[in-house]
Regions:
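Conserved beta-strand-loop-alpha-helix junction that forms the acyl-donor binding cleft
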Residues: 110-129, 142-143
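Conserved acetyl-CoA binding element of GNAT-fold acetyltransferases
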Residues: 72-93
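Conserved catalytic-core motifs of GNAT/GCN5-like acyltransferases
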Residues: 116, 134-149
Length: 160
């Protein structure tokens, strides 16, 4: 059974980070310039400001997502996942993520949601389309190691 909760525990973050796919670990390393560390990734995202949620399958966390405020009305997403989120629950994870994004707009908390991904994550880029993200720009040299990143956004043009 798939369930969503808006109050993920630190333990949920740790469990997801333990199982995190290699490409997500490499992205975190590229962004931070530090070797991937389960505790660091879990605690860093757990303590980030903004709304967070956890998706559980049979009471085990498979994905944690959230939005970190950048400025009023603008939020940057994050997602920590397990392989099972993609192999067994892709549709549910996508549907829930899209609904959470919609709620950010409907509540008027956001007029812009954005996502930044390492340039090599083509598989992830394909997932962003059903979420409503549009590829916006290449951020040259954005990563700590000098690699490029890609900026995606979803904008509510009716905001005001």
């Amino acid at each position: 059974m798939i369930q969503t909760f808006t109050n993920p525990l630190l333990l949920d973050f740790i469990k997801v980070c333990i199982k995190m796919p290699q490409d997500e670990r490499e992205q975190l390393e590229a962004f931070t310039g530090e070797k991937f560390d389960i505790d660091g990734a879990a605690i860093g995202n757990f303590t980030a400001p903004g709304p967070k949620w956890v998706i559980k399958a049979d009471d085990e966390p498979i994905m944690i997502g959230g939005f970190v405020p950048q400025r009023p009305g603008v939020w940057r997403d994050f997602a920590l996942t397990t392989p099972e989120a993609w192999t067994d629950h892709w549709f549910a994870v996508t549907r829930i993520s899209r609904r959470v994004m919609n709620a950010m707009f409907l509540s008027k908390q956001a007029h812009r949601l954005e996502c930044i991904a390492h340039h090599s994550r083509e598989k992830a880029f394909r997932w962003y389309k059903p979420l409503g993200y549009t590829r916006e720009a290449t951020l040259s040299g954005y990563c700590a190691n000098g690699a490029d990143a890609i900026l995606f956004s979803r904008v509510d043009h009716g905001y005001r």
